[in-house]
């Protein structure tokens, strides 16, 4: 319907209502009609300018970045979620590093819907705005390789973190930095938190995969090399209550890796290390991870401090 028809219809509607209820077309009626016409005109202006009828919630942005990794000696990509309002301010944010699984890439968490989940929770006030970093790890288990010299662990915990802190408004300290991962990435997140105890304040192991030495990739090296990369053996070295970071473990009851994840949960309990353990319905799949994205983000938010240190304000 064009503008003239819309305005004419609004006028006729006001006068028609008066006639139906048996009242005269008085100056009051005409004033009411004018009000309706004015409202219709405003609506027409909004429609013509393409503005939404109600404000849309703000959304974050996912950007792709490539940087030079000194540990790997080559350029490496990562994707980074910047929360709503990031582009228009100077605020600094806590950061979560999310590692993909064996068959995944730096796009896996984005494809699962992590950006949309963060947008929803931030808009609802359920979590604070945060930065999410999703690096590329190929199929390297996020560990320093014992056999070929590829330092995938250092690349993740040092190179990626330093690049983010240098180029984005992250809060560059342990209390405001968490790490997590799914499947192979869960193994990686745990061993990195244990091997770099001053870097992360929380670690999330989602659908945790813990390999035995006999089934580990060859780049894990000898039994002694394996022990330095195995979360089960690393956590034993911390001693009772020895972890300085929050730990979350979840896995589906139909996941083929559930039994070893249970063993890790038991080891933490025996050592007196506080942690969260969740056994949920589900398997080792994208459907399972997508269903729990908001649970993961709530855990990270609760573990992170968003207070900006005074030194970063100067």
Residue ranges and their predicted role:
Residues 3-314:
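Non-catalytic cap/lid and distal C-terminal segments of serine-dependent acyl enzymes
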């Amino acid at each position: 319907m064009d503008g003239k028809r819309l305005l004419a219809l609004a006028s006729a509607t006001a006068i028609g209502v008066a006639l139906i209820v048996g009242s005269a077309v008085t100056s009051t009626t005409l004033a009411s009609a004018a009000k309706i016409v004015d409202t219709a005109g405003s609506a027409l202006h909004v429609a013509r300018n393409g503005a939404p009828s109600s404000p849309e919630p703000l959304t974050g942005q996912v950007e792709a970045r490539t940087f030079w990794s000194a540990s790997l000696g080559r350029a490496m990509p990562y994707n980074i979620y910047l929360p709503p309002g990031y582009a228009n301010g100077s605020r600094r944010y806590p950061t979560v590093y999310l590692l993909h699984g064996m068959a995944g890439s730096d796009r896996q968490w984005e494809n699962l819907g992590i950006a949309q989940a963060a947008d929803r929770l931030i808009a609802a006030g359920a979590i604070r705005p945060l930065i999410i970093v999703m690096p590329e790890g190929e199929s390297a288990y996020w560990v320093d390789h014992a056999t070929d010299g590829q330092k995938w662990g250092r690349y993740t915990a040092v190179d990626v973190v330093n690049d983010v802190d240098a180029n984005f408004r992250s809060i560059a300290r342990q209390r405001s930095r968490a790490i997590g991962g799914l499947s192979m990435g869960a193994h990686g997140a745990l061993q990195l938190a244990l091997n770099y105890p001053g870097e992360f304040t929380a670690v999330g192991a989602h659908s945790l995969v813990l390999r035995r030495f006999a089934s580990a990739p060859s780049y894990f090296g000898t039994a002694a090399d394996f022990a330095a990369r195995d979360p089960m053996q690393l956590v034993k070295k911390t001693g009772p209550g020895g972890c300085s970071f929050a730990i979350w473990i979840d896995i589906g009851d139909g996941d083929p890796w559930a039994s070893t994840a249970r063993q890790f949960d038991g080891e933490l309990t025996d050592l007196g290390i506080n942690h969260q353990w969740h056994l949920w319905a589900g398997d080792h799949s994208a459907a399972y991870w997508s269903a729990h994205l908001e649970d993961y983000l709530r855990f990270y938010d609760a573990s992170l401090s968003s207070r900006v240190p005074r030194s970063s304000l100067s």
